[in-house]
From Swiss-Prot:
InterPro entries tied to this protein: PCI_dom, PSD13_N, PSMD13, Rpn9_C, WH_DNA-bd_sf
Function per UniProt: Acts as a regulatory subunit of the 26S proteasome which is involved in the ATP-dependent degradation of ubiquitinated proteins.
Pfam family, one: Rpn9_C
Example GO BP: proteasome-mediated ubiquitin-dependent protein catabolic process
UniProt similarity note: Belongs to the proteasome subunit S11 family.
GO cellular component: cytosol; nucleus; proteasome regulatory particle, lid subcomplex
Gene name per UniProt: rpn9
Highest rank taxon of the organism: Eukaryota
UniProt domain PCI: residue ranges: 177-343
Protein name: Probable 26S proteasome regulatory subunit rpn9
Any one GO molecular function term: structural molecule activity
Keywords: Proteasome
Protein species of origin: Schizosaccharomyces pombe (strain 972 / ATCC 24843) (Fission yeast)
Length: 381
């Protein structure tokens, strides 16, 4: 029986090789050799290389269906599912969904948790593409619970989960969650293997999410290599807008209003953006002051944030409510005393400013030390 199966598989591989470009024919010879010797790990590795080759797209489905499936129980199940997903790229969404459901039904969830969760995340992606957001969400929640109970999670699984989750939150216009999951996705993948176009699209989406979401610390985005890919493109103004938002740069924000109004998503939220950048301007104002000089008048804040004095208290209360600052407002004297500012990742100019303040503080300590030394001479003699 094994000999007959081997002969049949040999004929199949020879037939497939004749349909393949000359550059790929050697791969089929290698597959046949490894299959006949039952070197499953080496065969799996060779197949992964084959399935990862862009030119093999039309050749993958018959190879997976007729060849890989014949020995699938003998190989790593996560890699088997990976090859299946690569093969289904040439299928319609409905056909891919049927194939994936069959894989899920055949997998032992407890024994092969990694392969199982990878499969249901792939199903969630198709549900999402088909507009079935609730079904996609249910699968993602289920996947998250399984991932939490896997001792070691392959980056392949994490990247897939975060990618689909990010797309889900984008579809739901949940900007803060999209921002978080997209950054997690990017941390799981090799950026060098992504196309420039894909990374620029991610940078655009991340920038919009950072601007519109309930996000007040832009450090992770500013320091991420994809963010700089916006420079030199038609989206460079978004790069500048994020920088303006980060430091509360109102003049730059106002110069970018023409571009903002060209993007409907931002144009419809201009009032929100105005409030957010004024919050950041307030934070920047406080940050620039020494901790012992953070008592501000409403008029000072009004000038820095370019709002009427009678709107300052509302701005401060908003900053307090979202945790950007802690402090006490004196409504009678129209003064606010700031006790702390939310920690943040600093840009180069902010680091330079902090260095200057540290030098000033160090000098003050030296001066105080000299005063104590001179004043105490008579006491310690």
């Amino acid at each position: 029986m094994d000999t007959e199966m081997s002969v049949n598989m040999s004929d199949f591989l020879h037939d497939q090789a004749t349909r393949a470009p000359e550059s790929l024919q050697q791969s089929y010879i290698l597959m046949e050799d490894l299959y006949e010797r039952k070197l499953w790990k080496q065969l799996t590795d060779a197949l992964i290389v084959f399935f990862d080759t862009p030119e093999t797209v039309p050749l993958r489905l018959p190879l997976y269906t007729n060849f890989v499936n014949s020995f699938r129980p003998n190989i790593n199940q996560l890699k088997a599912v990976y090859m299946g997903l690569k093969a289904f790229e040439s299928c319609s969404n409905d056909e891919a969904l049927r194939n994936l459901n069959q894989i899920v039904n055949e997998l032992d969830e407890e024994k092969y948790k990694d392969a199982y969760v990878y499969s249901i995340v792939a199903i969630a992606r198709i549900k999402l593409i088909s507009g079935k957001l609730d079904e996609a969400r249910e699968l993602l929640v289920k996947a998250s619970k399984i991932i939490d109970h896997i001792d070691y999670v392959e980056s392949l699984i994490h990247s897939s989960y975060y990618s689909v989750s990010a797309d889900y939150y984008k579809a739901k216009a949940d900007y803060a969650q999209y921002y978080r999951h997209c950054l997690l996705y990017l941390s799981c993948i090799d950026l060098d293997k992504c196309s420039h176009t894909e990374l620029v699209e991610r940078a655009v989406d991340l920038s919009v999410a950072a601007i519109l979401g309930d996000i007040y610390n832009f450090g992770e985005l500013l320091l991420h290599p994809v963010f700089e890919l916006l420079v030199g493109t038609q989206h460079e103004w978004l790069h500048d807008l994020v920088i303006a938002m980060n430091v509360g740069d109102l003049p730059l924000f106002e110069r970018l209003m023409g571009q903002i109004n060209k993007m409907p998503l931002l144009q419809s939220s201009v009032a929100l953006l105005g409030q957010k950048i004024r919050l950041m301007a307030l934070i920047e104002l406080v940050f620039q002051l020494p901790p012992n000089q953070r008592t501000l008048t409403f008029d000072t804040i009004a000038r820095a944030t370019r709002i009427p004095s009678n709107e300052v208290e509302l701005l401060i209360m908003r900053a307090l409510s979202v945790g950007l600052i802690t402090g006490v407002i004196d409504e009678v004297t129209q003064i606010v005393t700031i006790s702390s500012v939310q920690s943040r990742i600093l840009n180069h100019s902010q680091i330079a400013s902090m260095e200057s303040r540290l030098r000033e503080w160090n000098q003050n300590i030296k001066n105080l030390s000299n005063v104590v030394e001179i004043s105490g001479k008579g006491v310690f003699v």
